[in-house]
Amino acid sequence: MNNNTTDNSTLQQIAHAAVEPLGFEVLEVQVQSQGGEKIVLVRVDRLDEQPVTMEDLTKASRAAEAEFDRLDPVAGEYRLEFESPGSKRPLTRARHFERMLGLKARVRGEGHAFTAPIKAVSGDQVTFDVSGQDVTVSASAVQANLAEFPDRHR
């Protein structure tokens, strides 16, 4: 590895370019440190919204690994890991909120910080039921994660 330093958006672009042609969406890229080891964690979902399998993660990981090796965007040694979004599912686009309609989301941004059920989605606008009051935010202007796990795959 070389001494490049790359921000998460660039790492996300690299991962996206590698896995999107295979039918995957990159939801999130995080650089973490565990016990002195650097880990680049990539959360992916299937574009067809089917459950992510171990085979899917292997296929996405191999494709991205080749691209990360070619571009060498991370300084020093690191481990590239892939996982499905699971209970930590980031909600970054209106369609993510729409898919999880009725479930609770943890929302931060636009002067808000709350956990509430997703009530409605219209365009980029997402409405939540916050203690009986409708609160509408722009999906692209907030950070949100699923706060409860659905009882079935969505």
From Swiss-Prot:
InterPro entries: Ribosome_maturation_RimP, RimP_C, RimP_N, RimP_N_sf. Keywords: Cytoplasm, Ribosome biogenesis. One of its GO terms (biological process) is ribosomal small subunit assembly. GO terms for cellular component: cytosol. It is found in: Cytoplasm. SUPFAM superfamilies: YhbC-like, N-terminal domain. The keyword Cell inner membrane does not apply. The keyword Cytoplasm applies. Its main location: cytoplasm. Required for maturation of 30S ribosomal subunits. Belongs to the RimP family. This is Ribosome maturation factor RimP. The lineage of its organism: Bacteria, Thermotogati, Deinococcota, Deinococci, Deinococcales. The gene is rimP.
